[in-house]
Structures are given as C-alpha cells and as structure tokens.
Regions:
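Transmembrane beta-strands of outer-membrane beta-barrel pores
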Residues: 31-37, 57-59, 66-70, 91, ...
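Cleavable N-terminal export/targeting peptides
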Residues: 1-24
Length: 253
C-alpha cells in the first residue's frame, strides 16, 4: 500500500502546481516482456507493468514513474514496485542543433529493507544527479550516484558504492514510415565492487500510432554472470544481463 501512496502523493503534488494546463501534463502506461534497466533485468526476465506522469513549464520539468519489479524480493527484500521521482531543466544552446538537460532522479523501493536483506545490502533507495547534451540526433548523458547505488556495498572492505556513475550514448533516428530507431551503448561503473561494473547495449525500433507505441528491442551486456543473478529467494541461476529481445506496448496521453 505504501508504494501506491507514494505514487498518489507525487500525482497530488504535480496536480497542485499553479496554472497547469492540459498541455503541461503528460501521462503514460505500458506493458513490457521484461523491465530492463541499463541492460539488467529488474523483473527476472519476466513481464512488467509501468506508468508515469510528467509536468513541464518552460524548461522546467517534474515527473513520477513506477514499475513492477522482482529483484528486491529475490534478494529477500519486500518491495514489489519501484517508484522514481525526478526533476530538472532543459534548455537550448544552439537552436535546432545543441541542447542540454540537467536534473536529479531518486529511485524508491518502498518496504525493501528486511533483516535478511540488510545482511547483504544497504538501503536500495538511490539518488543520482545527471547531465546530458544532445547534438542533432545523438545524446550523451552522465549520471552520478550521491548515495549507494541500488544497495550495493562491499562489506568485506567496508566500502560503499557512492560515486558510481553511468555513461549513456544513444541516438534517436527517424528511419521513415513513422519508425524510430534507437541505438544505445552504456557503461556502468560501480565503485568498490569490481565485478559489478559492466557495459550494456541495445537497439530498439518503435512506431507511434497517435500515442500508442509498440516497440521491439535487442538488449545485452558484458556483465559478470556470477554477480548479476537473482537473489537466493528466487532459487534461480538466470543471468539477468543476457542478450535478449524485449517487446512492449506503451500509450502516451
């Protein structure tokens, strides 16, 4: 229930903002065969339901987004939903050529911590700051963790994962007939946990039918197969960073 309360609280905050016109608010809901984040499955390679809302005023934006997950429960935690809250500012440096985006993003996992979870991980709630530059169709984005990254902690050396970072290079290419091709490569550096660092890649194709957006993507990583497996509660040896195809359907309104 707390996860739903967080989402409703975020919705209430956005709706309470002054002078909000319908054009300032955007909503989205979707279903995907897997929730992949930075190449790693958050749902043990199983389907996910997702939804979010965004408010924009000039260059300022705020948003909330949520998805079903499995990885926390698999590690004996108690969170079935991830709730993301974010805000930032977008601006133009060179008209129609170069733009920027800076902001902060907090990932929340309500009720995640249990005694068994806390024996192996720290609090999974994570806050990152990010900055991005977009030149033509290409975007370079860097995210930097101000907290432990998703609960990762090196208990052997008593070192946290604060200062971990993610570098994301992607492009949004109109290939005609209303189709959009999105190639991506990323690098996740996890501080003080050597076998947690990896590179991921994806290639996605989507088409917008008046807000209804089906998509298909090939996703993969070079992540350590011994590190990125479900926790003990899942009783599974599935590699969560394996190469795979993900299909989805999203509705923007």
């Amino acid at each position: 229930m707390k996860s739903h309360a967080l989402g409703l609280a975020a919705l209430a905050t956005l709706l309470a903002l002054p002078a909000v016109s319908h054009a300032d608010l955007a909503f989205n809901v979707g279903a995907f065969s897997d929730y992949s984040y930075r190449g790693i499955s958050q749902t043990r390679l199983k389907p996910a339901l997702q939804g979010g809302l965004d408010y924009a005023a000039g260059g300022l934006y705020l948003g909330a987004w949520a998805s079903t997950i499995k990885w926390v429960e698999d590690a004996y935690g108690d969170a079935q939903v991830e709730v993301d809250l974010y805000g930032g500012y977008k601006g133009v440096l060179i008209k129609d050529t170069l733009s920027y985006d800076v902001g902060v993003l907090t990932y929340l996992y309500p009720n995640a911590k249990t005694p068994i979870w806390s024996a192996a991980y720290k609090d999974p709630n994570t806050t990152e700051v990010y900055g991005a530059l977009t030149y033509s169709v290409a975007t370079l984005k860097v995210s930097y963790a101000l907290t432990n990254l998703f609960g990762n902690y090196n208990f052997a050396s008593n070192q946290d994962s604060k200062g971990s970072y993610y570098v994301d290079l992607s492009a949004t290419i109109d290939v005609g007939a209303g189709l959009t091709l999105t190639p991506h490569v990323g690098y996740q550096k996890v501080r003080n946990i050597a076998n947690a660092t990896y590179t991921d890649y994806s290639l996605a194709l989507s088409k917008d039918f008046d807000g209804l957006v089906p998509s298909i993507a090939v996703v993969g990583t070079d992540a350590d197969k011994s590190f990125y497996v479900p926790g003990g509660a899942a009783n599974s040896t599935k590699f969560l960073g394996k190469s795979r195809v993900i299909v989805g359907l999203k509705y923007n309104f």
